């Protein structure tokens, strides 16, 4: 599981850099400033959680069950939160109205919060 967690974190990190560069260069010409800021929020949260997954993968004092819970919460959260933000920010560039799926953004955010909460609780339960 450790290799999977760290690999996913690295993939999310690489994609965040690519998407950030794409937003700063290609999308800057076609998106409104407001939509560009929205897109950048998705990139930023993806990168935060890429680093978080790498941290989780490298921690040796977290049991595998806890790591697995955190992994799936963060994986799902990033895909729903950042993914929906990317689609919503670029909505004007496609014929499909992605605002119809806007409700998944807060679900993704909630999953990210749960991932951090599981991490926090596992740390608080540890005996020094």
Regions found by a protein language model. Name each.
Residues 1-128:
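Polytopic transmembrane helical bundles with strong interfacial aromatic enrichment
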